[in-house]
UniProtKB/Swiss-Prot annotation:
The complex is composed of two ATP-binding proteins (PhnC), two transmembrane proteins (PhnE) and a solute-binding protein (PhnD). Keywords: ATP-binding, Cell inner membrane, Cell membrane, Membrane, Nucleotide-binding, Phosphonate transport, Translocase, Transport. This is Phosphonates import ATP-binding protein PhnC 2. It is found in: Cell inner membrane. The keyword Transit peptide does not apply. InterPro entries: AAA+_ATPase (IPR003593), ABC_transporter-like_ATP-bd (IPR003439), ABC_transporter-like_CS (IPR017871), ABC_transpr_PhnC (IPR012693), MetN_ABC_transporter-like (IPR050086), P-loop_NTPase (IPR027417). GO terms for molecular function: ABC-type phosphonate transporter activity; ATP binding; ATP hydrolysis activity. SUPFAM superfamilies: P-loop containing nucleoside triphosphate hydrolases. NCBIfam families: ABC_phnC. Residues 2-245 form the ABC transporter domain.
Amino acid sequence: MLTIDKLTKRFGEKTAVDAATIRVEKPTMIGIIGRSGAGKSTLLRMLNCLSSASEGTITFEGEEITGLRGAARRNWQSRCAMIFQQFNLVPRMDVVSNVLHGTLNKRSTFATMFNLYPQSDIHRAIEILDRLGIAEQAAKRAEALSGGQQQRVAIARALMQNPKIILADEPIASLDPMNAQVVMQALRRIHEEDGRMVIANLHTLDTARRYCDRVIGMRDGRIVFDGTPAQLTTGVARDIYGAGAGFSEAATSTEIDALDKPDIPTAKAYA
């Protein structure tokens, strides 16, 4: 389904991603972990064609993705949607219009200039917002929403593209623990209910273990771990993060006792 073969990205003499190889045979929820500068974001940007690879290839369903240009690249970016830590919403625009921006590459220049949307798209946008629990916020400006709500708007915008893959670059890094769990539960539901592949860069081990079927660890641009959440032991984590014997997972935990049992089963239930 998705094959990443020896993918490499260099910035001058620095190698940000070094011969990354990943094979995904079916829609899966994958968490990528590693310290800052490990190459996680660069890897996702190459997957989305926001950044070109120095070497290596990306293939999805038999189609070569590496090096796409113009309309072909825009089409791929619709099939492989991306959300970011910063949300990237238009603050003074209402929520539903932000969601509808997910259809921009499918609309004419005239429709884009005058902000014209078909009723069917508007209804679909509201349905997606309702699915994410924020339909009542549709008419509000994006800037009036909390961080967790804004990230769900960004997810809704991605879903408007009807993608096969959702890439999430540190989607909960700027959120409090409660909102972080709401966002991760939403991504897990999208994977389970829609059969979409979700690949998320994550900064906490407990989040990767709880929500992901597969965890990939990166260190200094290289993939040093690729396995199940159960295989992600403290010793393995120490190696991924290059930490000493004093390494503590608790320092990065996002667990909340009150939310210990989410509305959906954890990833372990699907292992």
